[in-house]
Curated annotation (Swiss-Prot):
A Pfam family it matches: FA_synthesis
EC identifiers of the protein: 2.3.1.274
Subunit and interaction comment: Homodimer. Probably interacts with PlsY.
Catalytic activity, reaction form: a fatty acyl-[ACP] + phosphate = an acyl phosphate + holo-[ACP]
Protein name listed in UniProt: Phosphate acyltransferase
Gene: plsX
Length: 336
């Protein structure tokens, strides 16, 4: 198998490079064909990778970057004021063919702005969209947009649907069911943009558009791809993650009660642990920026080692599936 090379913005995120380096090393150990390039302050990164096996160290490169983009920094500042940031250098490695994907836990707005500047969008795409896998009763659905585009036109939503369908196919869904997230399933429901997008999708060639889906239908697994603007999508994503965390905490509190509750908890806990693990946000961490001429994965800034590993694994899958090239080929057929 040919090598996969991923550039990691090692300085991004809420907790600095320690978790990022630990996740990188774990992914190297699990995937012999993987090569990683850590971008950041060399002295700091060299200390963190010291002591690794010779085999892992041979597949781990460090590239210097003298600047770091803050999590609360304006994207315009990142574009103009920090040409040697770890985020930008990692993206330039992808642009120059020295890496096949970039993973960052840094500032979302800055990452999107720099990705569009450095990598450019695919022909026919006005705006990239953030997409991630959401657990459902039937498995997973791809939800987009997750916050990159707060205000969207009907044409934007149409393009998101096309990109989401291709991404779902790359992840193994034969004929993805595509739906628009709405406040009802009837044709009369929704705002003007959603209604116009529905009209465009109903006439799309080669797209399995099934109509509107409500929030509860999303979790029942009624669609494989669910499309919405970034304002709605980000609220839905954060609410889902908060709900999953709250349910896990409430269950643990419940089973720490009296003797009977503890006995019931002892019997049920293995199954509940499996459920918690399946719904844990860390397991589904890693949102893809679809529509770029290169692979970019955004991790939660607060992600721990497991979550960062999930983001790197998503990048690996998209490399193996040649996702940007597949998108480019399908967009010519599906875009008006």
């Amino acid at each position: 198998m040919s090598a996969q090379i991923i550039a990691i913005d090692a300085m991004g995120g809420d907790f600095g490079p320690r978790n990022i380096v630990q996740a990188s090393i774990a992914c190297l150990s699990a995937t012999p064909s993987l090569h990683l390039t850590l971008v950041g302050q060399p002295s700091l990164l060299e200390d963190l990778v010291s002591g690794q096996s010779a085999a892992d160290r041979a597949r781990l490169q460090i590239v210097a970057a003298s600047e770091v983009i803050g999590m609360d920094e304006r994207p315009s500042q990142a574009l103009r004021g920090k040409p040697d940031s770890s985020m930008r250098v990692a993206l330039e490695l992808v642009r120059d063919g020295k890496a096949q994907a970039c993973v960052s836990a840094g500032n979302t707005g800055a990452l999107m702005a720099l990705s569009r500047l450095v990598l450019k969008t695919l022909p026919g795409i006005d705006r990239p969209a953030m997409v991630a896998a959401i657990p459902t009763q039937a498995g997973y659905c791809q939800l987009l947009d997750l916050g990159a585009n707060v205000d969207c036109s009907a044409e934007n939503l149409y393009q998101f649907a096309v990109m989401g369908s291709v991404a779902a196919q790359a992840l193994g869904v034969h004929r993805p069911r595509v739906a628009l997230l709405n406040i009802g399933t009837e044709d009369i429901k929704g705002n003007q943009q959603v209604k116009l997008a529905a009209s465009l999708l109903q006439n799309a060639r080669g797209l399995n558009y099934i109509g509107f889906v409500e929030g509860d239908g999303l979790y029942r697994g009624e669609a494989d791809v669910v499309v919405c603007d970034g304002f709605v999508g980000n609220i839905l994503l954060k609410s889902s993650e908060g709900l999953a965390t709250m349910i896990g905490a409430r269950i643990e509190t419940l089973f720490r009660g009296g003797l009977l509750a503890r006995a019931a908890g002892a019997m049920a806990m293995p199954l509940l642990r499996r459920l918690q693990a399946d719904l844990a946000p860390a397991r589904h961490n890693g949102a893809s920026f679809l529509g770029l001429q290169g692979i970019v994965i955004k991790s939660h800034g607060s992600a721990g080692v497991q979550g960062l590993q999930s983001a790197i694994q998503r990048a690996l899958i998209e490399i193996q599936e040649n996702l940007p090239q597949r998108l480019h080929g399908r967009l010519e057929d599906l875009l008006p």
